[in-house]
Amino acid sequence: MVSVGKKAPDFEMAGFYKGEFKTFRLSEYLGKWVVLCFYPGDFTFVUATEVSAVAEKYPEFQKLGVEVLSVSVDSVFVHKMWNDNELSKMVEGGIPFPMLSDGGGNVGTLYGVYDPEAGVENRGRFLIDPDGIIQGYEVLILPVGRNVSETLRQIQAFQLVRETKGAEVAPSGWKPGKKTLKPGPGLVGNVYKEWSVKEAFED
């Protein structure tokens, strides 16, 4: 079973990407941040909103040095049909990242998101750092979509912690430009002096 702070299981899957069918390995992305998104199925309702929303924000992921990989049990042929016939009408240019095929749910099982009774992946999102370590993940039931803006915010927070080697940490609701906390003996019992609850909700 996967866990934060542990190595993300490697995999190899066929995928549809920029009009071509290719093979992708997670280990090929070492040295980069990766958002690995599992979703239930092509030509479904919430999935269309999620995948297109990630595509719309893809330039922002790229600015942060992040690669995106989407995964479902659908074949690469169905991925192509979905992109060409629906998703390309929702976001200009269609999907700009690989759409991977996990037929049988083997990779989803490795990541704990495959539902063998339903035969689909649950909505799992894994944030993987350049060392291949899982920094965070979220798994939702099928009818509820994920928040892409929150994914971007969390990546920025993880990058802050990585860049400062833990000398600074990100409090609730932190965004770039907002106050961080610096762990140390002097902060014990004194967080209220450095941070107020309203800061969690300020833009």
From Swiss-Prot:
| Taxonomic superkingdom | Bacteria
What are the protein's GO molecular function terms?
thioredoxin peroxidase activity
Pfam families to which the protein is assigned, alphabetical: 1-cysPrx_C, AhpC-TSA
Task: Indicate whether Oxidoreductase appears among the record's keywords.
Answer: yes
Its BP terms in the Gene Ontology are: cell redox homeostasis; cellular response to stress; hydrogen peroxide catabolic process; response to oxidative stress
Listed EC numbers? 1.11.1.24
Q: Note the CDD domains from the entry.
A: PRX_Typ2cys
What keywords are assigned to this protein? Antioxidant, Oxidoreductase, Peroxidase, Redox-active center, Selenocysteine
Q: What class of enzyme is it?
A: oxidoreductase
Annotated Thioredoxin domain ranges read 2-160
Could you tell me which PROSITE patterns the record lists for this protein?
Answer: THIOREDOXIN_2 (PS51352)
The UniProt entry's sequence similarity note says: Belongs to the peroxiredoxin family. AhpC/Prx1 subfamily.
- Protein name listed in UniProt: Selenocysteine-containing peroxiredoxin PrxU
Species of origin reads: Peptoclostridium acidaminophilum
